[in-house]
Amino acid sequence: MAFETTFVMLKPGVLQRRLVGEVLSRFERKGLVLTALRLLCVDTATAELHYAEHREKPFYPSLIAYITSAPVVALAFKGENAISLVRTLCGSTRVEHAQPGTIRGDFALRTTTNIVHASDSPESAARELALYFSAQDFVEWRDGNYDFF
């Protein structure tokens, strides 16, 4: 098993609907270790860098508008197979395919505003973590309860 650090963004809808604690606890209950957290307003330039691979897709303008519309919570989690685990917890990006019990299945209302972003690969995680955090933002710590998860 790979010990990884991954990036998660709780999108504006999570804050607007007062779901931050509930969504955050889903990751914590699976034993992921929170190593960085920021509440921020994403500017257009950062949003465009983050979602550059979607630039030519029809939903790109609305995605950028959504991400920059209100604050987001940027998170870094560490754990065994963290990237895969986080994506499983989040569920399908398409709301109609998101299973009940997943974050999107339980809370997302529309695909275009699917409430959470999660890195899909080690390369994406590294790029996204660097986009939202600097080295001093990370707190390395050993969770004494880690072996119980």
From Swiss-Prot:
Top-level taxon: Bacteria
Subcellular location per the Swiss-Prot or TrEMBL entry: Cytoplasm
Molecular function as annotated in GO: ATP binding; metal ion binding; nucleoside diphosphate kinase activity
Cofactor: Mg(2+)
Matches recorded under Pfam families: NDK (PF00334)
Active site: 117
Entry GO CC: cytoplasm
Primary role: Major role in the synthesis of nucleoside triphosphates other than ATP. The ATP gamma phosphate is transferred to the NDP beta phosphate via a ping-pong mechanism, using a phosphorylated active-site intermediate.
Name used for this protein in its record: Nucleoside diphosphate kinase
Lineage summary: Bacteria, Pseudomonadati, Spirochaetota, Spirochaetia, Spirochaetales
